[in-house]
C-alpha cells in the first residue's frame, strides 16, 4: 500500500468460489453466494439486520436468491480487490464485476440478461417484471438520512431545503436521487447511482420502509418489464440487450480523524478581493494581507494556523495564476514566517481567461440537455467562468495547476469549491448524459469520474505534505469526500438560518438538530467539518450565534475576512473565535472523550427545554451549553459536581441538591468547566 494512503489500513480479501470477505479500515463486507453484501460490520457492529436482498419478480413469482452462483477472483492487492459473479435468477443470467477499494467503496457493475433464443419451455420469452434491492438496517442504527441533490437540479442547491434529518417513523419515499444515505451519528451506509437510464419505476425510486426491528432501504430498478424487452423475445439475429447497472455502496465513516488534524485545523478564510474596479471600469490591485500593517502579527497571535485565499488569488478563476508572482510568493513567505500555512482556491469552473478556453471549453464544460452551459460567475479582472464536468479533460489541467502553485508559489494545500460535487451533465462529447427511447437527452451524475479525479488530487497534495479542504454545500457523497481532509458546509442555508433566528420559534425551526448531526457534524463520515458563518451584524447574525449551534456538536465555524482588506476586517470573526480556540487547547478537547447532548451521561444533563449540553471528559472537564430558543431562560443542569465555572466570564454557578441553575441568553454558547 502506498505511503500516501496512510490514513487508511491495507485492504484484506479472502475470496473463494462461493464467498468473499473484504476488510478495510473499521469495516468488513461479506458476500455469500450473493451479488450484494450479506453482512456489513462497522466498528465491530453488525449494521444489517439480515443479508441485503436482490429481488426479482418473474411472471408474478418473486425470486430472492441467486441460483448457481459462483465468484471468481480477478485481482487482489492491499489497495483493491476485484471479483466476478455468475448466477441465474428466474429466466435471466446475472453477471457482475465487484470492486472494493481500501477506503471502503464497493463499486458494483452488473447485468441482468434474458435467456437466449434456444431456451426450452418458453424460457426465451422475457418474464422479468420487477427488480429491486432491499438493504435492511437494524433499527437502532437507522435513525438519520441524507440525500442529494436537495432540489430538482444539482446545479444550484435550494436555500430553503435541508436534505438530511431524523428518519420519520413512517418511512420515506423519493424519486431518483444519485446518492442516499442511512445511518446514525457515527456510522451509516451510502448508495450511489450515476444514471437513471435503466431505472424504470412507477412512483418512488427510493423508499425507507419501517419494520419491527429494522428499516429497509429499497432501491427500485424496475417496476415493470424493461421497455426494450417488451413485446419481443430473444433471437440470434436480433438479441435482447442486457440491462446494465453501476451502483456504489459504501459504509461510513471512511477513515479516522487524527487528533493532530483536529488540533491544528485553525483556518482563517480571506474572501477579500485582490482586484477592484474604478468608475471607468479599469482594474486596480488591492492590498495583500501581508501588506496590512500588523495583520499577520495579529493572525498569528490569535492562533491562526492556516489562511485560505479565495478566488481572486488567481487572475483567471480556478486557474492558480498569480497576477504578480513575486508579490504573491512574498505573501506566502511572510505567512510561513509567522507559522501560518496557506491554501489557494480551486473550484468547479473554467474561466474565459483560462489559456485553454479556446481549445477545450466545449469538451470540458457541463452541458444541459439542450446544449447550454451552466453557471457563468463574473468577476475581476473582467471574465466569466462556467461550470466544468470532471468527466471531461479539465481534471488533468487542474492537477497540473495544483502542482504548479504548490511547487512554484510554496502553497501548502488547496481549498476546493464544488470540485467534489458530481454536478449533473449531458455533454456527449465526454460521455455524459444519455438519449432515451423517444430521442430526448437526459443528464447523468459523474460520481465515479469525480472520485477518480479527487483521488489523484489527494495524491498530488498529500505527496507534497499538504491538506485538502472542500466546500460542497448539501453534497455529502462519500465516494468523493473520502479523498479530502476537511469540509466546509452550510453556505446555501445562511439566509434561512438568519430568518429562523429572528423568529419566535428559534433557529431549530428551520434546521432540526438531527439534520445538523447528519450533514454538518462529520463523525458519521470520517471528516472534520467547519460550518460556514457569514456574519451579518445588521441582521443580528454573528459567529458567536453560529457557535451556539455548532459547538454542542463538536464543530467549529470558520472565521473569515470579507470586504475591503483592512486590519479591522480581520477582527470581525477572529476576536471571538480565538477565545474558542484557546479554550479548546486549554481543555485538550481533541483528545478528550466527547459526550454528546443526545446521550445521557454521568457528568451533566440539561433538563431545560430547547437547551442542550455536550461534555468533553479529559484531564479537566468542559461542558458546552446552548439555549437555542428565541428568548433567555433559566436552565437547570443535573450534575454530581459541586459547581461549574464560566470559562469566559469567570462566574461560578454552585450546585444545589445536584442541580446547577443560571440564566442563559438565546443563541450564546456557554463554556463551563465542571468542577
Task: Show where each model-derived region lies.
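Aromatic- and acidic-residue-enriched carbohydrate-binding clefts of CAZyme catalytic domains
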Residues: 308-324, 355-393, 422-451
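Active-site neighborhood of glycoside hydrolase catalytic domains
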Residues: 390-481, 491-495, 502
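Active-site-adjacent "subsite" loops/lids of carbohydrate-active enzymes
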Residues: 284-289, 328, 332-333, 342-409, ...
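Acidic-aromatic substrate-binding/catalytic surfaces of carbohydrate-active enzymes
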Residues: 1-10, 14-90, 139-161
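Active-site-proximal substrate-binding groove within the catalytic cores of carbohydrate-active enzymes
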Residues: 240, 446, 451-639, 643-648, ...
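Polysaccharide-binding surfaces and accessory modules of carbohydrate-active proteins
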Residues: 1, 99, 107-206, 649
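Beta-strand-rich recognition/accessory modules
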Residues: 18, 23-25, 32-62, 88, ...
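C-terminal beta-strand-rich structural cap/linker in extracellular carbohydrate-active enzymes
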Residues: 656-675
